[in-house]
């Protein structure tokens, strides 16, 4: 062991550098803060997102944190009235029969009947949703409509 090879033990606590104690220390006069300006002042924390007075980036962007309804949106599989003509008169048309004929993909799907086309057969329709025009057309043909949940 020699004086020029001495060093602190691993994990030893080093002493804090004291600033503003003379120019020969390397951290005298301005204490590493530079000259003047916002970052040289006392209490120099700075507001989060502050960009020196110009309009900050988060104000330039659209409001991204506003309420969005997409997690609650109900997706319906659409079947038009004209497609229901393939069933015989008096048939109960529900999700199961629509899946069997391939008009709807699965039993768990929500189904909405829309009023495009004409219907000539009296059917008993049981679906999750139905448009006003579709309901009128089915009832005019002698059928009935029931909305299920």
UniProtKB/Swiss-Prot annotation:
Q: Which residues cross the membrane?
A: none
| N-terminal signal peptide | none
The Gene Ontology CC terms held by the record are: large ribosomal subunit
Q: Name one Pfam family in it.
A: Ribosomal_L27A
Keyword list, A-Z? Ribonucleoprotein, Ribosomal protein, RNA-binding, rRNA-binding
One GO process term, biological-process aspect: translation
Its family? Belongs to the universal ribosomal protein uL15 family.
Self-association and partners:
Part of the 50S ribosomal subunit.
**What is the protein's name according to its record?**
Large ribosomal subunit protein uL15
This protein's gene is called rplO
């Amino acid at each position: 062991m020699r004086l020029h090879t001495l060093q602190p033990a691993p994990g030893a606590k080093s002493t804090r550098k004291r600033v503003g104690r003379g120019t020969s220390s390397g951290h005298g006069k301005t204490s590493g803060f530079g000259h003047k300006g916002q970052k040289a002042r006392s209490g120099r924390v700075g507001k989060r997102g502050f960009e020196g007075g110009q309009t900050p980036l988060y104000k330039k962007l659209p409001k991204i944190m506003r309420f969005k309804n997409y997690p609650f949106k109900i997706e319906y599989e659409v079947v038009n009235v004209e497609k229901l003509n393939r069933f015989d008169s008096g048939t109960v048309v529900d999700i199961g029969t629509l899946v069997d004929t391939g008009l709807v993909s699965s039993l768990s799907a929500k189904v909405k009947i829309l009023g495009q086309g004409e219907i000539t057969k009296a059917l008993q329709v049981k679906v999750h949703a139905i448009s006003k025009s579709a309901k009128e057309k089915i009832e005019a043909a002698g059928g009935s409509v029931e909305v299920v949940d």
